């Protein structure tokens, strides 16, 4: 028996020891399952007939028990639903199992210069998030980042904006006229939408209906770009499945910070116009290379329509994690979902649409040195 197999066997025995005292009240039930350890996860194999019920609660209990017990040897990835796999075996009693995705070790925070981050992008075509986690925005379009003050949300928005401004075109919509807008201004980006801070005597100072109308105007301009690109792709491409890259268009990133603040003081008609425009960009923008990155403290339905939230692939929540504040962005979770990394700029992440990622896992956003 080789060293790798010995280590695998020791890990399986350890997992069985952990489950033995917690999973079942009847010790005899520990003989009614087996475990398989794969490169991408673990399979719990019930040996039928069994005297316990397998359901979502049972699946979640196994996850919660092993979540801490396997750290830091493995990082468990919380699936969005119970995962059942079919096994190739001649034994009818063991032809199916519960799959728990996990990765060996833990992902690490990037502490790099912006030049190093950009170099990573040009090597892979994906935006780095951690050393072994990155964002393929073509496969997984649009992003939403939530977190309370002090969570590191604004810092990470600035990091993303710097990256996206180098690899494509970008616009900054910032109702506070704060970090994001100042960064865009410093970089010489003219596509900045901020409120009017100095009163001109017309009552249009600060955030409110007039500012939201300015935002809608900017978004409708981007919508026109989207339709123009779609028209040119349709007219000039012979491919059935294609996108903006075939015609050499750059990706266009729309950053909206503190989205909830945009709606302050606006009437219903203007709010509806904003949300309808936002929805069209989110739903139709992918093929044309239009990508939205939204940030807010909480992704409540009154701020982000359900169709918008469901169409966003990259979801990040930074700061304190509990069942109350995860229910808007991660409604699948009903309790503490995994072992947090701790520290500023940490939280949880899920990337839908990319087969390399299968659920929710811890994140620590990059630190630019």
Predicted regions located by residue number:
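Generic recognition of flexible, low-complexity loop/linker segments
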Residues: 31-33, 240-244, 280-281
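P-loop NTPase catalytic phosphate-binding loop
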Residues: 44-46, 101-232, 252, 260-320, ...
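SF2 helicase catalytic motif II
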Residues: 255
């Amino acid at each position: 028996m080789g060293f790798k197999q010995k280590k695998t066997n020791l890990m399986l025995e350890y997992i069985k020891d952990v489950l033995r005292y917690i999973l079942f009240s009847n010790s005899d039930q520990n003989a009614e399952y087996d475990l398989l350890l794969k490169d991408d996860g673990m399979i719990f194999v019930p040996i039928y007939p069994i005297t316990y019920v397998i359901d979502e609660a049972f699946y979640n209990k196994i996850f919660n028990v092993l979540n801490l017990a396997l750290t830091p040897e493995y990082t468990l990835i919380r699936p969005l639903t119970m995962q059942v796999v079919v096994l190739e075996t001649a034994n009818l009693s063991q032809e199916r199992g519960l799959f728990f995705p996990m990765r060996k070790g833990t992902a690490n925070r990037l502490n790099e210069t912006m030049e190093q981050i950009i170099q990573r992008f040009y090597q892979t075509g994906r935006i780095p998030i951690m050393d072994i986690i990155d964002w393929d925005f073509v496969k997984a379009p649009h992003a939403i980042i939530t977190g309370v003050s002090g969570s590191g949300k604004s810092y990470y928005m600035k990091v993303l904006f710097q990256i996206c401004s180098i690899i494509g075109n970008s616009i900054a919509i910032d109702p506070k006229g704060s970090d994001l807008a100042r960064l865009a201004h410093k970089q010489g980006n003219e596509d900045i939408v901020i409120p009017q801070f100095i009163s001109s005597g017309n009552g249009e100072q600060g955030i409110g209906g007039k500012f939201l109308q300015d935002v809608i105007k900017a978004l409708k301009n981007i919508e026109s770009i989207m339709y123009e690109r779609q028209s040119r792709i349709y007219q000039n491409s012979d491919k059935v499945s294609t996108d903006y890259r075939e015609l050499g268009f750059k990706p266009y990133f729309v950053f909206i910070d503190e989205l909830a603040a945009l709606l302050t003081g606006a009437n219903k008609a203007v709010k509806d116009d904003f949300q309808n425009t936002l929805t069209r960009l989110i739903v139709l923008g992918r093929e044309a290379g239009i990508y939205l990155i939204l940030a807010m403290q909480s992704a409540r339905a009154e701020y982000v329509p359900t169709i918008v939230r469901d169409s966003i692939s990259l979801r990040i929540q930074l700061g304190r994690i509990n069942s109350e504040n995860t229910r808007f962005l991660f409604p699948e979770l009903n309790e503490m979902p995994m072992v947090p990394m701790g520290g500023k700029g940490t939280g949880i992440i899920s990337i839908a649409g990319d087969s390399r990622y299968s659920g929710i896992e811890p994140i620590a956003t990059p630190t630019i040195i």
